[in-house]
Amino acid sequence: MLHLIKMVSKIVLLITLVFIVSAVTGSDTWVGECDYACENGKNAIDACCSQKGYAPRGYCPNGMHARCQYSVI
């Protein structure tokens, strides 16, 4: 049982590291179709990214061009 708990915790740690590394390495891309959402706030950007097949995490670094993050999983 203890071995199973250790194995699960290692898997969780690995998944967490993958998310951190992908965030640090800039795993996102400009999505022109979502540029309109920059004027409508964070929820609109996240929704547009999700609809386009990206992870529901987006942002507008310069207020004009929406960037969406790739799904890690």
Swiss-Prot record:
Keywords: Signal. Residues 1-23 form the signal peptide. This is Uncharacterized protein 308L. It comes from Invertebrate iridescent virus 6 (IIV-6). The lineage of its organism: Viruses, Varidnaviria, Bamfordvirae, Nucleocytoviricota, Megaviricetes.
